């Protein structure tokens, strides 16, 4: 960081402190800007290619799908805000509950907004349609070959399947209703097996797993319910940490990696996929343990939002070892939930787990953005990790990982040596007039700041990086440059 940049930060912090003091003396709330509208993005070895404001909606999960000769982004949204429960859809002129944005990103420099599908009523986490996964009908064993299917959540009450063969004119296929919560599901396109993060009514937790056969999306078949012993209906005693999400390696890898906990009480669970699908179904303690190979309880201070399997990796420093020179690695990402590093939450970060001995997985490395580099705890909103890309396309897989860090943007990590991960790039988007404030209490008064809140990230096979913002700023399409681009093996741009 340059001397000029340090001086700018000191001036900003001084002005911010004066503003807060004046607000408290006057007894009213204050909105301060850590970033200013018109300021350029902050970046290293990453650059902005394209942008879409997503109609000013708080965004969660982007899924990028190669659809014929087009590339389409399906982006899930949180519900609206108290101030704007129904943002306007410029395509229809109507106020609409936030749901799913469908954007043509074939030309990433000029994304085209095609359609908004409204979601469930409710603000913030209570509404919207946060999650998206997409499969081609021709890949599903019993799918309509002419169809393309979007699996999305509908608030916390349902999962929906839509035919998006014409992405500008989606058609609802079916809705799986009667749930008390939903979240970050996984769908295998080559088998149709879906691991749905749900809230079955009789379970003791908000979120658990429903395993479905969606090989024919028009005729879903429920296979079983799954969770940790003590969460199932009729159980007693302490309730274990609720589910957050999972990632399957499919029939070839025969593993499902479950992550329990968000910012506390994290658990990594390694499960035999075949035993989970074909084993005994009744959710009693023995049957819930039956498919489990290994389980790692993290510190109570950290969660397990994303459990991304990197598979077998050659460890550079072990290259001359005659035994175990390759290791089976899982990357775990926590999620920060607290604004401005306040009480009640430890620093959330990234952990690298050696799961070569699956019954005894162990943490071997970690990564965190240095807070003092830019005084992120004072910028406003959340500072800490949230989510990583989940694409296993060769362009980045086992080479670069991208992790969102809320007000610290998205960070590019060199993971070729997972025992020694290192940051090789970052991009912190600029705020706009649409960027929403985030508040904390100071002496009983609301003190609010406007800052970027990079929420989730995904990549595509072409090597583009898609970052969406929780604070309503929109979609940023990025590419890596310099040394980060060389690591990916992409041609110079």
Q: Can you name each region flagged by the protein language model?
A:
Residues 17-29:
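Bacterial N-terminal signal peptides
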Residues 10-13, 19, 277:
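Residues marking helix boundaries in flexible regions
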Residues 15-16, 411:
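Basic side chains
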Residues 1-14:
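N-terminal secretory signal peptides that target proteins for export/translocation
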Residues 30-493:
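Feature marking well-ordered beta-strand scaffolds used for ligand recognition
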């Amino acid at each position: 960081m340059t001397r000029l940049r340090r001086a700018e930060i000191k001036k900003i912090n001084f002005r911010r402190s004066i503003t807060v003091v004046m607000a408290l003396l006057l007894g009213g709330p204050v909105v301060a800007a850590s970033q200013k509208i018109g300021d350029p993005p902050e970046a290293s070895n990453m650059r902005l290619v394209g942008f879409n404001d997503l109609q000013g909606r708080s965004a969660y999960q982007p899924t990028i799908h190669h659809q014929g000769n087009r590339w389409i982004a399906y982006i899930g949204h949180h519900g609206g805000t108290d101030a704007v429960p129904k943002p306007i859809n410029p395509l229809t002129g109507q106020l609409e509950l936030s749901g799913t944005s469908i954007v043509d990103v074939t030309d990433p420099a000029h994304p085209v907004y095609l359609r908004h599908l409204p979601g469930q009523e409710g603000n913030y986490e209570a509404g919207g349609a946060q999650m998206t996964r997409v499969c081609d009908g021709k890949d599903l064993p019993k799918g309509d070959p002419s169809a393309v299917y979007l699996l999305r959540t509908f608030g916390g009450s349902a999962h929906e399947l839509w035919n998006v063969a014409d992405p500008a004119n989606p058609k609802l296929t079916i809705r799986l209703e009667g749930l008390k919560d939903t979240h970050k599901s996984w769908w295998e396109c080559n088998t149709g097996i879906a691991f749905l993060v749900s809230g079955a009514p009789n379970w003791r937790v908000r979120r658990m797993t429903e395993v479905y056969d969606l090989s024919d999306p028009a005729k879903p078949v429920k296979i079983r319910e799954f969770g940790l012993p003590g969460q199932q209906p009729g159980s007693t005693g302490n309730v274990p940490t609720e589910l957050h999400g999972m990632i399957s390696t499919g029939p070839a890898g025969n593993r499902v990696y479950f992550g329990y906990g968000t910012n506390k009480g994290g658990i990594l669970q390694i499960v035999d996929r075949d035993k989970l699908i074909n084993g005994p179904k009744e959710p009693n303690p023995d049957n819930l343990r039956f498919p489990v190979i290994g389980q790692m309880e993290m510190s109570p201070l950290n969660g397990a939002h994303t459990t991304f399997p990197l598979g077998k990796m050659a460890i550079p420093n072990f290259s001359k070892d005659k035994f175990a020179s390759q290791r089976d690695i899982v990357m775990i990402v926590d999620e920060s939930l607290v604004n401005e590093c306040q009480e009640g939450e430890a620093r959330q970060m990234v952990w690298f787990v050696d799961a070569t001995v699956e019954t005894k997985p162990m943490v071997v490395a970690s990564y965190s953005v240095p807070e003092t580099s830019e005084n992120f705890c004072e910028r406003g909103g959340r500072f800490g990790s949230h989510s990583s890309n989940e694409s296993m396309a060769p362009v980045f897989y086992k080479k670069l990982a991208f992790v969102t860090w809320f007000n610290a943007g998205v960070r590019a990590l060199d993971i070729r040596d997972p025992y020694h991960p290192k940051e090789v790039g970052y991009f912190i988007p600029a705020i706009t007039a649409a960027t929403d404030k985030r508040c904390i209490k100071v002496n009983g008064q609301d003190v609010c700041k406007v800052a970027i809140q990079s929420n989730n990230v995904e990549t595509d096979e072409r090597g583009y990086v898609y970052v969406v913002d929780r604070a309503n700023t929109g979609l940023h399409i990025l590419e890596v440059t310099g040394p980060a681009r060389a690591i990916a093996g992409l041609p110079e741009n």
